[in-house]
A protein has these predicted regions:
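Catalytic, metal-anchored helix/loop core of enzyme active sites in primary metabolism
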Residues: 1-388
Length: 388
């Protein structure tokens, strides 16, 4: 049995992860048990999760919300932690075997490092961890003998395809698929007046607001490009991206003999979540089966980097290296937050990300503080640019 510490339990990935746990337990197999839960501030849902799954410990990032939760669960046998210290405590919890980090944003970096240093198996859904601090994270994983299990559907697909690989030298390239988001096929002029409600209408996936906006700008694919470089030790020149509107082929790998292997499935995040939680074993899934006969065709297109500028900015950022990817990530988080508040336009997100990718200095990363400072500087730049 794996004892799970779930960080981000009230978010999109977290709630779907708990659906997976319910399904596994319903099948009568105690493969996964919830030992710890963490959330930002949604204590109403977190309290319900505590009463259902009976974890030994929980953490709430928001300090005031943590105090409210303590009062609400006085009758429960559960330890309540708070703040960043609380997240890191849960990530390194002695009772946990595996940590699923599904928190959104840079707040996920320090808990990721805490889990690795505690030698916990790590299922990683927090994209920003690898984008901003990839070198630190992979070094910590290597030093502590931890294999990182990807939860993103694209990286899970690659991870699954690689299971039959004999040696790394056999691998020629990886090919990430992108849905293209809600604005596929539109030009920049057609996107000048886009509102948050428009950008939040994803054609295939059920995701949180921030990730859905990233999908609309193709920033998510730029982020996943950087993730793939770190997770699979790839030269960026050997990573390709294609737009695949149906979201049935989740990613592909090409071997040096030009054989191409793909992982397919319906677009449902519970598939990669479950594989990460139960790896290397597989269990029955709550997700419906894929019927290829239902699809008359599967389509593939080159990404439009002229319209969706965030994607190219991420490629330039990883090419420059150092703290630039962390700065780009920070700029995007800040710009997306402003867009969701309707304080800037959709095109302004790409403008901010590109400016940071091309002008911010590439400082060497020696510690977490270097990453956090690059993130802070980029956010300050966006605030100054748009909120004067």
């Amino acid at each position: 049995m794996k004892k799970l510490a779930l960080l981000g339990s009230t978010g999109s990935i977290g709630t779907q992860a708990l659906d997976v746990v319910r399904c596994i337990q319903k099948e009568g197999d105690g493969a996964v048990e919830v030992t710890a839960l963490a959330a930002h501030s949604n204590i109403r849902l977190l309290e319900a999760q505590i009463r259902e799954f009976k974890p030994q410990a929980v953490a709430v990032f928001d300090l005031q919300a943590a105090e409210q939760l303590r009062a609400a669960v006085r009758d429960c046998d559960v330890r309540v932690y708070s703040g960043m210290e609380g997240l890191c405590a849960l990530a390194a919890l002695e009772e946990a075997d595996i940590v699923l980090n599904s928190v959104v944003g840079m707040v996920g970096l320090e808990p990721t490092l805490a889990a690795l240093r505690a030698k916990k198996q790590l299922a990683l859904a927090n994209k920003e961890t690898l984008v901003a601090g990839g070198a630190l994270v992979m070094q910590a994983a290597k030093e502590n003998g931890v294999e990182i299990l990807p939860v993103d559907s694209e990286h899970s697909a690659i991870f699954q395809c690689l299971q039959g690989m004999h040696t790394k030298s056999d691998l020629s390239r990886v090919i990430l698929t992108a849905s293209g988001g809600p604005f596929f096929g539109r030009d920049r002029d057609a996107l000048r007046d886009v509102r948050p409600a428009d950008a939040l209408k994803h054609p295939n996936w059920d995701m949180g607001a921030k990730v859905t906006i990233d999908s609309s700008t193709l920033m998510n694919k730029g982020v996943e490009f950087i993730e793939a470089k770190w997770l699979f030790d790839m030269d960026p020149a050997d990573i390709d991206v294609v737009v695949h509107r149906e979201s049935v082929v989740h990613s592909l790998i090409e071997y040096r003999d030009n054989s191409v292997i793909a992982q397919l499935g319906v677009p449902d995040m519970r598939i990669p979540i479950q594989y990460a939680l139960t790896y290397p074993r597989r269990y029955p899934s709550p997700v419906r089966r894929l019927s290829l006969a239902d699809w008359q065709k599967l389509t593939f297109f080159a990404p439009d980097e002229e319209t969706f500028t965030c994607f190219g900015a991420c490629k330039r950022a990883i090419g420059r290296g150092g703290t630039v990817p962390a700065a780009v990530n920070g700029a995007n988080e800040a710009a997306v937050a402003l867009f969701l508040q309707e304080k800037i336009g959709w095109l302004d997100i790409g403008e901010a990300v590109c400016a940071v990718a091309d002008t911010f200095p590439a400082q060497r990363i020696a510690c977490v503080g270097d990453v956090l400072e690059a993130d802070r500087a980029a956010r300050a730049y966006v605030a100054e640019k748009f909120c004067r």
